Swiss-Prot record:
Its EC number is 2.5.1.6. GO terms for molecular function: ATP binding; magnesium ion binding; methionine adenosyltransferase activity. It comes from Streptococcus pyogenes serotype M4 (strain MGAS10750). The lineage of its organism: Bacteria, Bacillati, Bacillota, Bacilli, Lactobacillales. Binds 2 divalent ions per subunit. Binds 1 potassium ion per subunit. This is S-adenosylmethionine synthase. The gene is metK. NCBIfam families: metK. It is found in: Cytoplasm.
């Protein structure tokens, strides 16, 4: 009897309370970067019934209308009706932002290496905090992501498309998905075992109608038929009713969906959130760099699965460690891959910012449906432009 393994990941829609908070934080970041690419931003958001609080630390020459940014973001998500208990024009907006701590700024603005005489411009910026970050890639999908999180994201994106187009008129913005994939003894995905979808809806919609529409127009549209069989289980709004949702149902906070944002639990996570942070915060930029490295390693055929860990000390430019784990799938020793990575990628914060062009207002679009593996938008850390360089670097190391 072959060994049966199950793995589950989840995603949430743009109308989920925590994702509303993420999108507001990143909309503020983008608005600031559009005027001041050198700004340092750490913007946190809390949302609940009828109210939005924005707080954190910002150092910038830009002036932005935070009230307008917040309301526009909420409207774009779809909270435009007072009956939702949270709407763009009636919500209270309460900003409380201060300047970044001078103690932190001195280490970011002039790294330890620069203070000790290193004249390289890319050694000038120090890491905005200590910490460890992970990036991951696997050959389960064309975008080199784990299948469970890839399908979970696609399901809630499809729900949003049907809601915004009006094709399913009773849908409201809040939704969640969860997909359980069965793997064979070789760790290859063979079928989808369980799909869970909870979607907010108008009170008039019936459970039978919701179930039929979600299965036919969402699940079967997203999940390839080869993965579905008579034993696949569908749980559609299993509580029986989901009218009260969004911030009226639960409060939301920036940074509470870090597993949804990355690999759905399939890879390790360093614990740092992304949204609302400029690229001097290595929680964000180094996580993107680690994904960039891992994806190019797998695309180069150097491994079928790769996890990259980077770690930093606050105020220091060079990473304190670089680790590559291929789980026994690499074609060369992992020490060789680590040496090649150090040759090809400049992993100082300024090097990452330059390599991935991270001073641009590109972040709001990442704040829902995943920061990694996106095929609907062009993100620099998803590009496969280091494949040849990695292959050549491996040859020189060997």
């Amino acid at each position: 009897m072959s060994e049966r393994k199950l793995f589950t990941s989840e995603s949430v829609s743009e109308g989920h309370p925590d994702k509303i908070a993420d999108q507001i934080s990143d909309a503020i970041l983008d608005a600031i970067l559009a005027e001041d690419p050198e700004a340092h931003v750490a913007a946190e958001t809390c949302v609940y019934t009828g109210s939005v609080h924005v707080f954190g630390e910002i150092s910038t020459t830009a002036y932005i209308d935070i009230n307008r940014v917040v309301r526009d973001t909420i409207a774009e998500i779809g909270y435009t009706e007072a009956e939702y208990g949270f709407s763009a024009e009636s919500v209270g907006v309460h900003p409380s932002l201060v300047e970044q701590s001078g103690d932190i700024a001195q280490g970011v603005n002039e790294a330890l290496e620069s203070r000790e005489g290193d004249t390289d411009d890319l050694s000038h910026i120090g890491a905005g905090d200590q910490g460890l970050m992970f990036g991951f890639a696997i050959n389960e999908t064309p975008e080199l992501m784990p299948l469970p999180i890839s399908l979970s994201h696609q399901l809630v994106r499809r729900l949003a498309e049907l809601r915004k187009s009006g094709e399913i008129s009773y849908l409201r913005p809040d939704a969640k998905s969860q997909v359980t994939v069965e793997y064979d003894e070789h760790d290859k995905p063979v079928r989808v075992d369980t799909v869970v979808i909870s979607t907010q809806h108008d009170p008039e919609a019936t459970n039978d109608q919701i179930r039929q529409d979600v299965i036919e127009k969402v699940i079967k549209d997203v999940i390839p038929a080869d993965y579905l069989d008579d034993d696949t289980k569908f749980f559609i709004n299993p509580t029986g009713r989901f009218v009260i949702g969004g911030p009226q149902g639960d409060s939301g906070l920036t940074g509470r969906k870090i597993i949804v944002d990355t690999y759905g639990g399939y890879s390790r996570h360093g614990g740092g959130a992304f949204s609302g942070k400029d690229a001097t915060k290595v929680d964000r930029s180094a996580s993107y760099a680690a994904r960039y490295i891992a994806k190019n390693l797998v695309a180069a055929g150097l491994a079928t699965k790769a996890e990259v860990q980077l770690a930093y000390a606050i105020g220091v430019a060079q990473p304190v460690s670089v680790r590559v784990d291929t789980f026994g799938t690499s074609t060369v020793p992992e020490a060789v891959l680590e040496a090649a990575v150090r040759q090809v990628f400049d992993l100082r914060p300024a090097g990452i910012i330059q390599m991935l062009d991270l001073k641009r207002p590109i972040y709001k679009q990442t704040a829902a449906y995943g920061h990694m593996g996106r095929t609907d938008i062009d993100l620099p850390w998803e590009r496969l432009n280091k494949v040849d360089a990695l292959v050549e670097a491996v040859k020189t190391v060997l």
